[in-house]
Structure formats: C-alpha cells, structure tokens
Amino acid sequence: MELVLKDAQSALTVSETTFGRDFNEALVHQVVVAYAAGARQGTRAQKTRAEITGSGKKPWRQKGTGRARSGSIKSPIWRSGGVTFAARPQDHSQKVNKKMYRGALKSILSELVRQDRLIVVEKFSVEAPKTKLLAQKLKDMALEDVLIITGELDENLFLAARNLHKVDVRDANGIDPVSLIAFDKVVMTADAVKQVEEMLA
C-alpha cells in the first residue's frame, strides 16, 4: 500500500501488515490499559494499628468512668489511630507480550490511516527553537491537537513544541499506544515511517 506525502507530489510505499491491518479493539484496549497501569507509581502507604507510634497503655480503666471502654490509643476508631485495612505499596504493572504490543501499535497506526488522522510528510522541522515558528507552521497545516514523530529527535522542534498545548514531539523509538490515540492528528516524517516499519516487522 502507499501513503501520500503531504508536502511532496509523491507517495511512500509501506507494508500492508503495519499500516493496513484490521483494527483489533480488544487487543488495543488490553495494551493501553496495561501501559497506563505500568505508569502508576503505586507508592501509597498507610499504617495499621501495629505500626502507629505511641504507648500501648490502656487510656483509662475499663469500668467506672462513664466513658466508652477503650483499650488503645492506636485503635482505628480513634483520631490519629491506625487504618483498619491499610494501603500498601504495590506494583500495578501488567505483563504484555512483545507480539501483543506490536500488534496493538499496528492496529492503531492502521486505524489512523483509515480515519485520515495520519499525515505523512517528507520532513518536518523549524529553523530555530522558537514556539512562534512552530505555531505558525501548524496553523498553516490546520493542525492543533497533534503528535509529531520524526526519525531522529530534532532539538529545535522539541524546544519549540514544549510550550504549545496539545502538541508533542517524539522520535520513532519513543512512540507508545497511549500517545498515538491521545491526539487528533499524528504527523510522521518519511524516515519515521520507515523506522516504525522496521521496529514492528
């Protein structure tokens, strides 16, 4: 199959298996959920009554005070006491096979092509690391919410995009399923397309 280059009167021949396969919604969902789960820190932690610092002495005698009976200041019922079912640090990551991960990326890229959300260009750059230059270039191309993928990370482009809302710049090795579906449009250079093809082959 061929992808038309927007900034040139030519087309780029690409693999049908990478850019023309059927959309596997279940696979994409599983991989996206796993990717997002892997990004969780999982560092939350609370203390049980056994871990609270303080005396183990009974606050007051069992009977005769008129107050409710109490055996410990660390009781979960008390303010600043322990937590009954205390949260523990945990690893939320899920195992995803390489074949599944690559299959999900291929499904997403193919769907982007079908929905006309993938724009392929010969090259994409700015002369200087100026936000104004990139903003004007995107405006000329009628792009707002966009992920830009280049063969190698262009420092000028990266710096120019840092202060633009809903614009991100990645190199071909830095793509992931969440980023690909998070933006309205994806701009890829011809070099990036070839690199992604090799990576997913």
Swiss-Prot record:
Region of interest (Disordered), residue spans: 46-71
Domain of life: Bacteria
Record's keyword annotation contains Metal-binding: no
GO cellular component term, pick one: ribosome
Positions of disulphide bridges: none
Gene Ontology BP annotations: translation
GO molecular function, one term: structural constituent of ribosome
Keyword terms, alphabetized: Ribonucleoprotein, Ribosomal protein, RNA-binding, rRNA-binding
Family note: Belongs to the universal ribosomal protein uL4 family.
Subunit structure and binding partners: Part of the 50S ribosomal subunit.
PANTHER family tied to this protein: 50S RIBOSOMAL PROTEIN L4, LARGE RIBOSOMAL SUBUNIT PROTEIN UL4M
Function, in words: One of the primary rRNA binding proteins, this protein initially binds near the 5'-end of the 23S rRNA. It is important during the early stages of 50S assembly. It makes multiple contacts with different domains of the 23S rRNA in the assembled 50S subunit and ribosome.
Name by which UniProt lists this protein: Large ribosomal subunit protein uL4
